Amino acid sequence: MASRAIFVFPPFRLDAANEQLWRDSNRVDLRPKTFEVLLYLVQNAQRLVTKRELLDSVWAGASVSDELLRGYVRELRDALGDDAKKPRYIETVPTRGYRFLPRVNDESSVQTPPSELKPAKAPRELRVGILHSLTGTMASTESPVVDATLLAIEEINERGGILGREIQPVVIDGASDERAFARQAIALIAEAKVCAIFGCWTSASRKSVLPIVEQRDHLLIYPTQYEGMEQCSHIFYTGAAPNQQIIPAINWAVGFLRKKRFFLVGWNSIYSRAANAIIRDEVEASGGEIVGEEYVLPDSTEVTRVVRTIAQTEPDLIFNSLVGDMNLFYTRLLRAAGITPEKIPTVYFSVGEIELQSLSAREIVGDYAAWNYFQSLDRPENHAFVKRFRSRYGRHRVVADTMEAGYLGVHLWAQAAHATDPDDVAAIRRALPNQSFEGPGGRVRIDAENQHTWKTMRLGRIVEGGQFEVIWSSEKPIRPEPYPSSRSPTAWNEFLNKLHTAWGGNWTKSQSAISQLDDGHSAE
């Protein structure tokens, strides 16, 4: 059957050569990738097509989420007038794949529609990569960013794409492993031929992808708040720089809460080490004191010791830079030790609405988080964004800062692509500076000098229901400064290089390698 140019399952005719689907004499519009999914199912009519087989055929072996595939099947059912519960065309075989039910007739029985009814063939699609952790420790945190990124792509495609060309996402799993991120970035550029990569969360994953986009003259759009100390012409940063999150939070804790004694909790990553170095500089410059600085590993028994140390030192406030699932065990032990927000509050730098879904209200209500965006923001643009997201993914879903930053990154890139040749990665990089967008959290703009984004900073108090009450906001968007002013760029680069060397050339490391450092802050 694969050699046929025309496939018929009344009242539909599928013209493979011209990538057209007809219902009687009426053309049925399908996106290019949706057509490819249908074509493969039709070519293999009346037999089970596994998900893996379908993904390998249509996406050439690239890693694509099941949710994305289900979205294309839903589109097909809508176009065919099919019912998932009582299918006439596409049957879902739970956990296995799909079966195209109708018998497909020989092409000899087909009368091709008049040529005058055939529109011009649509221009080819624009492929973009989405590279986040869909498995491993970071999956629960990163997967929602994929959803927000896909939502932005869908919005742009609904408006005609980029110069009439549909954006086709290629979603790949970084597996919570910096080496996997590097391998997958190469695959996206060399094999999938994407014209941009949206992704990475941890600084370790970004640092692993950085030399790849540099060497291949490519483009990464990075959506996460981070420690700064970096400026790469091949990366555009839509998350917060330190002066847009960490430093204002310190100033607020010292100036508004009047706290003097601080405890720092992080994990064995470049982000936590660098963030805590920034905090130490700022706190000591203000006359405050760091009474403890500890780092934990995922699932580490060291968490119990860290909590015991916090109880013994009795700080005024804890700054927490743990990420992903690491906060679950730590927070429960903290509360079990009697350390509550009323006694010793915590300011989180990586806990947002997504993470709050995994923590019970009694464990976290009253603590604080520093971000640029909260779902609770009362802005028309935000209400519309939340409504669209929930309409697409379910009313139970929440949105968070990095999801909004991922969403912004797609729209900023699309504006730059519209303004130049969308296939020319270097031209898009030149067009991105000074692009601005009215996002859910306010107007943002890419700085022309450092490729970071002007953003409004906000502090939120955790309230019942897993949301935040905004208690402080900067008066206007803050210009990004990737290198904190407490040290020179050279000194910060030396700080990072010392960590990288101590960790055996990696950006995260096991506890045994951490012990090579003299103490919790000797890399300074």
Where do the model's predicted regions map?
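DNA-binding patch around the recognition helix
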Residues: A2-F7, D29, L41-Q46, V64-Q111
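A structural micro-motif at secondary-structure boundaries
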Residues: R4, R13-F35, N105, P113
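Short amphipathic alpha-helical recognition elements used for nucleic-acid or partner binding
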Residues: N26-V58
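Flexible coil/turn residues that form the inter-helical turn or adjacent wing/linker of helix-turn-helix
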Residues: R47, A62, D421
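Defense-system signaling and execution modules centered on TIR/cGAS-STING-like, death/scaffold domains
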Residues: L101-A122, S522
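Extracytosolic ligand-binding ectodomains
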Residues: K118-E524
